[in-house]
Regions:
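Glycine-rich phosphate/pyrophosphate-handling loop used in enzymes and phosphotransfer proteins
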Residues: 1-178, 182-210
Length: 210
């Protein structure tokens, strides 16, 4: 046990998916697992979309779905930097004028129960990678029921008015970060609140699309 702890301290990290040592320092996903991840295209959003760009590099399939659930519901926080690493690789698909990051907020009760906000844990390393600030004062003011199992109409109704921004936003182009996009109801409602607070343009970067 002591020898393995020493090895882990001086050797590269272990892959979060298979446990093998990664060959590159600070890499959380080995080359083999990275090649096997269910990647999908991120086409330009339709003209009716409120977003400048919407990027989700992975499909919500195994092993991505299992890893996201483990992060959120089993407190497997080691997945967060791995997802951030994958999002940093996808940042080349984003516009180059983004000037601040907004992780999707949790209601305070859910965050207290969970102990963390998964979007914030993923968003912090991405913000550091891009050299951008995290926007403060963005709040989920209503404890909405879980979105799981709801159709698109019910998801939108469930989230109506859920977000508020408690300060004027001076940044012109914001990047919302989330773990999964399903119908897009969450990020659209957050986008609406950000625009009311002064944002001119909003893009979205999520780990996966369901």
């Amino acid at each position: 046990m002591l020898l393995r702890a020493f090895d882990d301290a001086v050797m590269p990290l272990r892959c979060v998916f298979c446990g093998a040592r990664t060959r590159e320092p600070e890499k959380h996903v080995c080359a083999g697992c990275d090649a096997d991840l269910p990647r999908i295209a991120s086409p330009p959003p339709p003209a009716s979309s409120p977003f400048e760009t919407e990027v989700a590099p992975l499909a919500y399939e195994f092993p991505v779905d299992a890893a996201i659930k483990a992060l959120k519901f089993q407190r497997k926080l080691f997945y967060a930097p791995a997802f951030a690493e994958l999002l940093c690789d996808a940042c080349a698909l984003l516009p180059n004028d983004i000037d601040a990051i907004v992780p999707v907020p949790l209601h305070w009760r859910r965050r207290w129960f969970r102990g963390f906000n998964q979007a914030h844990e993923i968003g912090k390393p991405v913000a550091r990678y891009l050299g951008l600030p995290l926007v403060r004062g963005v709040v989920r003011r209503r404890a909405t029921p879980s979105q799981s199992g709801l159709n698109a109409h019910d998801r939108a109704r469930n989230l109506r008015g859920a977000f508020v921004v408690r300060r004027t936003i001076s940044h012109r182009h914001l990047l919302i970060i989330d773990d999964v996009i399903t119908t897009g109801a969450t990020v659209r409602q957050l986008c609406r609140a950000l625009r009311v607070a002064g944002a001119e343009r909003v893009s979205v970067l999520a780990v996966a699309r369901a």
